């Protein structure tokens, strides 16, 4: 299944959520209505749907331009291009990341293997991901946080989509353990906001730590703290970026937990 198909499936799910939320908005009593923000966001949302293909063309042009200016025989270049393809064209991402796994420099080979495992887990190839995970030891210390994150994702996907209950429980425990290890590892670092590329993917440990802190606060029902963390990040990142969408969606989940229907709809639209 290609990334494009997966994207369409996720879009259908999002549209269903939005349609339900909008229908509820339409029948709410008038005293609950915000002045104009929901209507404005709905108009923006319609415009963004119409211009979706322009973003695809923009990304394609950016990748093609970058490929023409760097040495594509170098593992680091292959990793860079492979990561850019991940949310856009799955087959190309697999191709370039697989090439980079043959790098003679151990850290580059294992870095690309970790990205490849993450991608394989995302598209349902769990067995291949687990097989590759057995090739990672010994692991360069610089990749420890990425290793924890990747294995948490791999076990998490296997838990959600697995069929055997005993194995699902095993993967759930493993995912939780790796997430805890990642949380501890990130907290031990002196992390600060750094430049976030419009096309960046999973490269900013400060953002990952903030996301984990937000989720932890939400799980503890400390919604004020969760919203504060989200606001801190959203003030730093630009709209119309992948990072903004992620944290806007996390904010959506907070307001859903709080049963704040208007704020839920507002942030659902912003995240989309």
Could you say what each language-model-derived stretch is?
Residues 2-13:
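Bacterial N-terminal signal peptides that target proteins for export
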Residues 12-23:
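Bacterial N-terminal signal peptides
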Residues 24-272:
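A "functional boundary" signal
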